[in-house]
């Protein structure tokens, strides 16, 4: 991994990524699992790189009485060729995971875009709204025609309190 990619990976606050991007639980757990497997692989690679890879057969020949065994082992090591592993199945699994993660990311992008549009429209409405001091009763009647009927019904029944007002805002009466 390049130094830039490594530094970028360390700079990310992975704990808050899921909440900030509003990822679903499956995507967040998949990212966490991938990060833990990556950390294990990096640790294993570090330990393997620290190990010595050469064998001093001359030392073993001088120490051991049976030099034939040392010769066999040396010839076996020289003739050793690592097994080539077909990585296609693993690459397919990685590609499938990547496709699923990409699909999840695209869904999240669409959700965020929709939410941003909704919030932008709401903000625009708030910015363009008249102050409440400038709104008249006639404006209210035009905006919500049924309000006049509701108020008339409340007045004829002698109800002077809006239902739910006290529960929401408390009782402001002094007496």
UniProtKB/Swiss-Prot annotation:
The keyword Ion transport applies. The modification N-acetylserine is found at residue 2. Keywords: Acetylation, ATP synthesis, CF(0), Hydrogen ion transport, Ion transport, Membrane, Mitochondrion, Mitochondrion inner membrane, Transport. GO terms for cellular component: matrix side of mitochondrial inner membrane; mitochondrion; proton-transporting ATP synthase complex. It comes from the Eukaryota. It is a peripheral membrane protein. One of its GO terms (molecular function) is proton transmembrane transporter activity. InterPro entries: ATP_synth_F0_dsu_mt, ATP_synth_F0_dsu_sf_mt. One of its GO terms (biological process) is proton motive force-driven ATP synthesis. It is found in: Mitochondrion inner membrane. Belongs to the ATPase d subunit family. Mitochondrial membrane ATP synthase (F(1)F(0) ATP synthase or Complex V) produces ATP from ADP in the presence of a proton gradient across the membrane which is generated by electron transport complexes of the respiratory chain. F-type ATPases consist of two structural domains, F(1) - containing the extramembraneous catalytic core, and F(0) - containing the membrane proton channel, linked together by a central stalk and a peripheral stalk. During catalysis, ATP synthesis in the catalytic domain of F(1) is coupled via a rotary mechanism of the central stalk subunits to proton translocation. This is ATP synthase subunit d, mitochondrial. It comes from Schizosaccharomyces pombe (strain 972 / ATCC 24843) (Fission yeast). The lineage of its organism: Eukaryota, Fungi, Dikarya, Ascomycota, Taphrinomycotina.
């Amino acid at each position: 991994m390049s130094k830039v990619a490594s530094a970028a990976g360390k700079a990310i606050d992975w704990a808050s990524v899921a909440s900030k991007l509003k990822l679903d639980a499956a995507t967040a757990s998949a990212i966490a699992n991938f990060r833990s497997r990556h950390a294990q692989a990096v640790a294993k690679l570090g330990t393997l790189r620290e190990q010595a890879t050469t064998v001093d057969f001359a030392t073993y020949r001088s120490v051991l009485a049976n030099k034939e065994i040392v010769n066999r082992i040396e010839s076996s090591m020289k003739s050793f060729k690592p097994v080539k592993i077909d990585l296609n199945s693993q690459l397919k699994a990685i590609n499938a995971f990547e496709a699923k993660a990409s699909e999840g990311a695209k869904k999240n992008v669409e959700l965020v875009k929709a939410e941003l549009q909704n919030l932008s429209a709401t903000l625009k409405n708030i910015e363009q709204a008249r102050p409440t001091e400038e709104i008249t009763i006639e404006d209210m009647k035009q905006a919500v025609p049924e309000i006049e009927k509701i108020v008339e019904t409340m007045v004829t029944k002698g109800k002077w309190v809006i239902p739910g007002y006290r529960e929401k805002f408390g009782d402001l009466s002094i007496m």
